Amino acid sequence: MSMRGLRACALACLIPLAAAAGQDGSAAALTAAQIVEKNAEARGGLEAWRKIDAMVWSGHIETGSPVAPLIPFVFELKRPNKTRFELREDQDKMVRVFDGAAGWKVRTSRGGAPALKPYTPAELASAREAQGIDGLLIDHQAKGIDIALDGIDEVEGRKAYRLVATLRSGSKRHVWVDAETFLELKTDREAHTSGTQPGIVTVFYRNWRAIEGLKMPTTIETHAADGKGGEKMVIDHVSMNPSLSDARFARPNDLGRHHALPGFQSAGPGDGSLPHSMGPSK
């Protein structure tokens, strides 16, 4: 798969997405507000998440391609809505940076000069609506997101509450919450491919683990709107509240220089260690 296609699928993983599955069940015993409250409790608590101002993930993407089956990535997030995403494939490097208002993308190819481009209008809209650190449900009122209960489905054999999240922009997302664990099973949104017709992008959240008392999915599987199969983002390590300068999320200037993550060793493919390793699966 090309870096362009991988980038689209990987970033779709960091923005909640998915398609409805199953039929509506009987009337739900819980309200949307109660489901959201139980979700926050299951993930470690609302106040605990409010204390997280920055986060760094490192791991790899399983592409399913024999050419580059595993591609290392580092994803940095800082409130209120700053992100930096870096992929490395052999001698190629792709970086996407969003400072909360504007975004840029840089690609360095083998033997070629780095190319810097601004985000497209569609990419900007997507980045501005991302809820990277804690997702759509946690602290949704502070984010201006309205949550409503839309029914009950079965997702991969598990009963799930289907919620509709309406963002400030008016765009909608669907979120399926496990009726037993109250963790997210999948989400969806409408997305445009290279064609003119929109499609539904689906993201499944798997292998939830406790990291410093907070629950996070460590496998995020994305199925793109064009239906060209799926990819898995596997999060191997997470750092909570690292020191991240705002310069990490500014317009890249020195395109030829690799900046190591603050406080971490610079690592090549296959060695993306961060100081905090995930605990056993819960």
Where is each model-derived feature located?
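Compositionally biased, proline/threonine/alanine/serine-rich low-complexity intrinsically disordered stretches
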Residues: G22-A28, N39, L255, H259-K282
